[in-house]
């Protein structure tokens, strides 16, 4: 058993989890966000989004100043009070966005893979794809250690593309809407473990952890959590964990922020 009164960290995916996949609404989760904030429980956002996007969302959600995990773990934005840590304000893992872009351009030109990256289009096009405002769409292009793309080729070619990326030290990861290319060594799980270790070092006690996610790219994060909420999502593959002990893992009946609230209700309301 655990409660929000003990040292606790909550790690949360965004699109399809804390945010509605289509409207980006988060209001159903607002009461729990307020309760966690009042209990001094950090809610650490963890997403494929850029750090620029996530810093904007932190302010919207009342989570400013906390650490966050961007670009599927390739970027860690440090907490405001962690200024003494090397790399402040951000730690970037592995290959840079520019280097990945060069690799992708070479593969497209020489091996004729079909895809469109966010670097190929303007913010107006991204607005059409996502429903975001123009100003928010511009933030989606500020990648530091990954590339986001739409795949426009066959499944067979995707397998070949993935293999080529792996040979070059990169990974190809599916998100809620788009695909992402990043360093093979990066991941939400590694980033979360680093943040957990930092909190433990600063407080002298390892915090209990709860993670929430809805897609296959959230599985590594949820695997390293003490407790996990798998929010019902739109992805046909779903989320599958090695340890799905019902005492540790809760699968919601609701989607998006309604499911996020359901997961928190399950683990805490009776405690």
Swiss-Prot record:
Main localization, broad class: cytoplasm
Residues engaged in binding Mg(2+): 13, 15, 214
UniProt record, GO biological process: mannosylglycerate biosynthetic process
E.C. number: 3.1.3.70
UniProt cofactor(s): Mg(2+)
Family matches, as CDD domains: HAD_Pase
UniProt keyword terms in alphabetical order: Cytoplasm, Hydrolase, Magnesium, Metal-binding
EC category: hydrolase
Sequence similarity: Belongs to the HAD-like hydrolase superfamily. MPGP family.
Protein name: Mannosyl-3-phosphoglycerate phosphatase
Organism (species): Shigella dysenteriae serotype 1 (strain Sd197)
């Amino acid at each position: 058993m655990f409660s929000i009164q003990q040292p606790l960290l909550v790690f949360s995916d965004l699109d399809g989890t804390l945010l509605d996949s289509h409207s980006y609404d988060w209001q159903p989760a607002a009461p729990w966000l307020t309760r966690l904030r009042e209990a001094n429980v950090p809610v650490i956002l963890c997403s494929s989004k850029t750090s620029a996007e996530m810093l904007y969302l932190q302010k919207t959600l009342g989570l400013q100043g906390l650490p966050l995990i961007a670009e599927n773990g390739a970027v860690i934005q440090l907490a405001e009070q962690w200024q003494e840590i090397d790399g402040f304000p951000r730690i970037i893992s592995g290959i840079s966005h520019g280097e990945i872009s060069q690799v992708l351009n070479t593969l497209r030109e020489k091996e004729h893979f079909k895809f469109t990256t966010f670097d190929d289009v303007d913010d107006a096009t991204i607005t059409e794809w996502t429903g975001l405002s123009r100003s928010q769409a511009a933030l989606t292009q500020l990648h530091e250690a990954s590339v986001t793309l739409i795949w426009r080729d066959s499944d067979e070619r995707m397998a070949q593309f993935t293999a080529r990326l792996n040979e070059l030290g990169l990974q190809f990861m599916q998100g809620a809407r788009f695909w992402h290319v990043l360093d093979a060594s990066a991941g939400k799980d590694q980033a979360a473990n680093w943040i957990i270790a930092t909190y433990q070092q600063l407080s002298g006690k390892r915090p209990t952890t709860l993670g929430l996610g809805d897609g296959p790219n959230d599985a590594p994060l949820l695997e390293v959590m003490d407790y996990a909420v798998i929010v019902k999502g739109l992805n046909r593959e779903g989320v599958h964990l090695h340890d799905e002990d019902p005492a540790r893992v809760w699968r919601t009946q609701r989607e998006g922020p309604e499911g996020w609230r359901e997961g928190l209700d399950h683990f805490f309301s009776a405690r």
